[in-house]
Amino acid sequence: MCKFKEPTAIRSQLILMPQSLDEMVSQQEPVRLLCEVMDRLDYGRLESSYPGGGCPAYPPRVLVKLLTLAYSMGQRSSRKIAEALRVDLRYMWLAEGLTPDFRTLARFRREKGDYLQELFEQSTRLAVEVGLVLLAHVAIDGTKVESVAGSHSLWGKRRIEQEREAIRQILEEAEEIDRLEDEELGDNDGTSLPDALRDVAARKRRVDEAEKQLRESGKQVISTTEPESRPMRTSRGVRMSYNVQAAVDSTTQVVLGMTVTQDENDRRQLGAMLSEVYRNTGCKPAVVSADKGYYSAGNLKILDEREQVGAISVPKLPPQCKRPGVYGIDCFEYDEIGDTYRCPAGKLLTFRQTSDKGNSVYRVYICGDCQGCLQRELCGAGKHGKRLDVNVGNSLRMRMERFLATDAGRAAAVLRKQVVEPVFGQTKENRKFRRFMLRGLKGASIETALVFLVHNVFKVMPKLAYQPA
């Protein structure tokens, strides 16, 4: 009896009844379901962007499917994707025998980025249609993704000074060498420029150009290879990065909106993300949550104006009482229903008027019952009674604090971490989305749209798999 199995095929032998690509890919292979979901998207605008004429182009829907499959496996190099089209049956099956080269894939990704972002938006609407999105709770958060630019491209005032000092030392050394050589060799060869001086001349041009860009930008630090990226704090220290924002539905962690920004902090992103969610779904979420990085008086006002229930973590503030023995605003109890404040002595302060001070709007509350109050000195009441000027942002802050103290508020704060942070974990760890491959803010937006398109498609796939035929 033979100990090992014999090969069933001889490589050089012709096959009488060759297998089709469809037979070579298992019916349970996820790429089949991926193709089915991708076929539900509308490629009309993308296809109409091709002028026609000349050599026929590769079908854009095929190129999108190939990029989606590659990104799902953490493969974003166009050369690696082109190689997979020659050796991986899943890619061959998805491309239906077409073999676009790496230049075609790279050019398509770069030039058709706007349409790729539209396809991401369609993926959110598809998730809504199949019942994966309920909009009961949407969590918003941001994460830093490193840009193409490396730390070697960073230029600041300090580095420019160091480079100029290094150039000065090189020139001094070169002059000293010239002097010694002149003494030794005389006029033997004075026509060629020494290598050291040729290198330092190019180095000086780079420093001059970096100094010019730094001065024109008005920033402390710039990247000469990718000026749109910004230095941001990441888990690996300060890196040139972009801030990727995502709004995620709590039902199945579908991404409902995304943006890429140059701002390191998240304070200016809430309004834009709410608009993205509404534009992509046509509905307003019941509750929106975000961490304290989104806290600002402006964001609280946005929630108030849109009548949007929000759960934004409120950072702790130092005590309002700056003068010892004098009550601060935090010592006064606010009644939202009656729009009144009650002082520590139990007396009522009622709303009288609004007042503009600088860039802030204040609501003025007056107590006319301060005569004979034993705590008047502690309260700091004036001749006509206690006047309390409350920044409009403070009242919204207190309203948010009261909501977060309720069962619903606490539940929303806890749920936020369970909704949005796993999405970033999946994209960064499983799909290796830690660094962009396209340069500039637009390139970063294109790649982010592709990554979240993949995320949403893979959320829809199980839903379709269990639907009856």
Set out the residue ranges of the language-model regions.
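A short secondary-structure junction motif
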Residues: R40-R45, D88, M92, N430
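Anion-binding and metal-coordination hotspots
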Residues: F4-T8, L67, G74-V87, E96-A469
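Basic, short loop/linker segments at the boundary and entry of helix-turn-helix/winged-helix-like folds
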Residues: V25-T68, M73, L396-M398
